[in-house]
């Protein structure tokens, strides 16, 4: 595949056979959160070397420790967060880390607070573990989504034990500021609550915004947080199954040690090796990708303003996901169905992100810019035919 992102074609992407381009044949894939830009050369080189060695058995302790050290170095360099290597644990993915957090770090049966719209599995995983999800819709202030602190406070008062915090936020693209997180922490601490902080999109932040790990803010946040992250979104590795659970206090580390054998089962050798290479050698590739995505998020705004001005859009501060307000189109609560059927463009239905997502759609713009332009053209033409 071409290393010039503009030169990658729809035919190239379909030939790869990835989920985004194979699940709905003949369409433009702008739904599932994976990118169309291949992978960083240091990552693929590390994978080839591991395959050539035949490293297909159980995860070696030394390989897991290398990844922990790599992430700790990345966190220190990029975020100024000094995390002890022993507190970075190898996991299969963010959802596995959430399952461990709910099962072993909250009171049995306690509900989970979820600001919505939200990453879709956050709505479905807690109920599979016997936990109620209390949706607290985000508020919009001055054109930006913010947390409803009164709603979060009320949910904790009603017996919830855990707040799921997603930063950078999927799907709305907010990158929380320190003051916002300090206010959230005050509410959590007042109720003796816990926070699960999903920071998988942290490397994908645009100029003018800075990622601050929630657990790094204060001793208070460190004491009540388990953080989950991975190189999988920023370096396009979701199928390789590796992530990091980051513990930020001694009590959690001791508790984690009691369940680690089960909790950490599933992190794959190749995924761990790929994460290590990404954190240690993937910076230049990531910088090029983020610069390209920055152009895409701006171009998406221009295209929508020109072709479909009825769709509301605010360029995200992080992630490669555009949150499209389609309510003015008067096409119902599930606009993605129209765009898939009549435009041949597959988006993620906002309803899947919770009740607050009705009438919205999530657009993955991590694609070649000519394909992005083609997608919006097809959407506009479909609406014009109605």
Protein language model regions, located:
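PLP-dependent enzyme catalytic core of the Aspartate aminotransferase-like
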Residues: 73, 334, 338-347, 353-386
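Conserved glycine-rich beta-strand-loop-beta hairpin in the small C-terminal domain of fold type I
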Residues: 276, 293-301, 313-326
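Helix C-cap/helix->beta junction micro-motif
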Residues: 129, 190-191, 221, 343
């Amino acid at each position: 595949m071409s290393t010039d992102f503009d030169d990658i074609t729809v035919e190239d992407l379909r030939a790869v056979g990835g989920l985004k381009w194979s699940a709905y044949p003949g369409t433009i894939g702008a739904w599932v959160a994976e990118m169309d830009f291949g992978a960083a050369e240091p990552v693929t080189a590390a994978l080839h070397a591991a395959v050539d060695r035949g490293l297909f058995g159980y995860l070696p302790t030394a390989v897991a420790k290398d990844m922990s050290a790599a992430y700790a170095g990345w966190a220190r360099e990029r975020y100024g967060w000094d995390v002890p290597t022993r507190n970075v644990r190898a996991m299969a993915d963010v959802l596995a880390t959430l399952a461990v957090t709910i099962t072993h770090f909250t009171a049995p049966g306690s509900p989970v607070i979820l600001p919505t719209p939200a990453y879709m599995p956050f709505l479905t995983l807690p109920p599979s573990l016997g936990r109620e999800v209390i949706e607290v819709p985000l508020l919009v202030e001055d054109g930006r989504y913010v947390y409803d602190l009164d709603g979060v406070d009320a949910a904790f008062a009603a017996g919830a034990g855990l707040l799921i915090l997603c930063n950078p936020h999927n799907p709305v693209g907010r990158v929380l500021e320190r003051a916002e997180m300090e206010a959230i922490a005050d509410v959590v601490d007042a109720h003796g609550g816990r926070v699960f902080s999903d920071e998988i999109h942290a490397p994908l932040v645009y100029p003018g915004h800075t990622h601050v790990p929630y657990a790094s803010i204060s001793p208070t946040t460190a004491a009540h947080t388990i953080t989950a992250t991975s190189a999988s979104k920023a370096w396009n590795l979701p199928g390789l199954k590796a992530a990091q659970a980051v513990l930020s206090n001694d009590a959690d580390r001791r508790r984690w040690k009691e369940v680690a054998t089960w909790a950490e089962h599933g992190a794959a050798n190749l995924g761990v090796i790929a994460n290590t290479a990404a954190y240690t050698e993937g910076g230049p590739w990531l910088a090029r990708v983020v610069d390209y995505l920055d152009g895409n998020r701006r171009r998406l705004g221009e295209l929508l303003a020109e072709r479909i001005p009825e769709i509301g859009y605010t360029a995200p501060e992080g992630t490669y996901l555009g949150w499209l307000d389609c309510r003015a189109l008067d096409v119902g609560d599930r606009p993605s169905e129209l765009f898939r059927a009549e435009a041949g463009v597959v988006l993620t239905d906002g309803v899947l992100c919770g009740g607050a997502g009705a009438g919205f759609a999530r657009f993955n713009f991590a694609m070649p810019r000519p394909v992005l332009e083609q997608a919006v053209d097809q959407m506009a033409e479909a609406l014009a035919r109605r």
